[in-house]
Amino acid sequence: MSDRCPFRQILIRSRMFRLLPVLAVFSFASCTTVPELGGLVDRGGTSGRKIVVSLKSQRADLFHRGKLVATSPISSGREGKATPVGKFQVIEKDIDHLSSLYGNYVKGGKIVKENVDIRKGGRPAGSKFQGVPMPYFLRFNGAYGLHAGNIPGYPASSGCVRLPKRQAKRFYDAVRLGTPVVVQR
């Protein structure tokens, strides 16, 4: 670029070019995924709480400073819709969460198509999607979370970890953003 380029001359004169590296850093930083922001939220260090989910036993345990304070039966992801295994942290709390994928199509207050996955099939004309309620939702990985739901005694969910409503509320009330969640086989 020559010194005759008007854009370059404007940048040099206004000293805006000094801000470009800073702006670049901030624009890349905004692409960071939420779990990587762990330094900004509680990792269990200050609250001392941790959730451990056992897929084999279909059970979730809540620990406080290493001591078991609550346990609950669960229903994890069914075959083909497995709950992810690994170490995560609570990245969102939503007391009255609604599914954005699973629910019913409703028209005029009446269900016209029930138990749908919006990624499959079409929406009936004039209808609106109504997501399934997922009370006491604790998101720990992408679309996955712990929440109140049906507990049939075996893996039956679409990947989330369902708990009885009373226990879901207890876990919800006890944890903060950043609380570790360990999901093991």
Task: Identify what each model region corresponds to.
Residues 56-58, 65-68, 77-79, 93-96, ...:
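Solvent-exposed coil/turn segments that connect beta secondary-structure elements
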Residues 1-13:
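N-terminal secretory signal peptides that target proteins for export/translocation
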Residues 20-29:
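Bacterial N-terminal signal peptides
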Residues 39-63:
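Post-signal peptide N-terminal segment of mature Sec-exported envelope proteins
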